[in-house]
Amino acid sequence: MAKTASSLVLPIIFLVMFALVEQNMGCMAVLGSCGVITDCSGECISRFGPQARGYCDRDGGSGTCVCVYPCPADKPHM
């Protein structure tokens, strides 16, 4: 009995963990070049609301302005 119960613990932990992660994921949008958009955070807030976070992903060149924001209820998570 103890062995059966312990073999169920790990799958249950993973199910709970993945259920919580899905609820906390947001949406993401790429706005353009950080060379053109000088205030990436401000632009994200103006487009997606006060809970949006913007940052410049400097993967090369002038970088890319990326926004992370809460998904609308009708839009699926990524």
Curated annotation (Swiss-Prot):
Keywords: Antimicrobial, Disulfide bond, Fungicide, Plant defense, Secreted, Signal
Disulfide bonds: C27-C71, C34-C56, C40-C65, C44-C67
Transmembrane region(s): none
Main location group: secreted
Cellular compartments per GO CC: extracellular region
Keyword Disulfide bond found: yes
Protein known as: Defensin-like protein 171
Organism of provenance: Arabidopsis thaliana (Mouse-ear cress)
